[in-house]
Amino acid sequence: MKVSVTVKPYARQARVIATDQGLIVYVDAAPVEGKANRRLLELCARHFGVARSQVRICHGTSGRHKILEIS
């Protein structure tokens, strides 16, 4: 399954919000050296109830708009 995600870094509290267009993920990490991407994968894995290894970024590794693949 592929999911469209908008990432909001530097959030005070990490959370995932489902919308009609996909997910908005507030990440409590800085977008430096992949820290925000790693935290994004952890949060999405927890949200969908799968292992972190089953979530990967298909498109948008360096931007705020991403496509995730959950297997």
How should these model regions be labeled?
Residues 45:
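The alpha-helix within a helix-turn-helix
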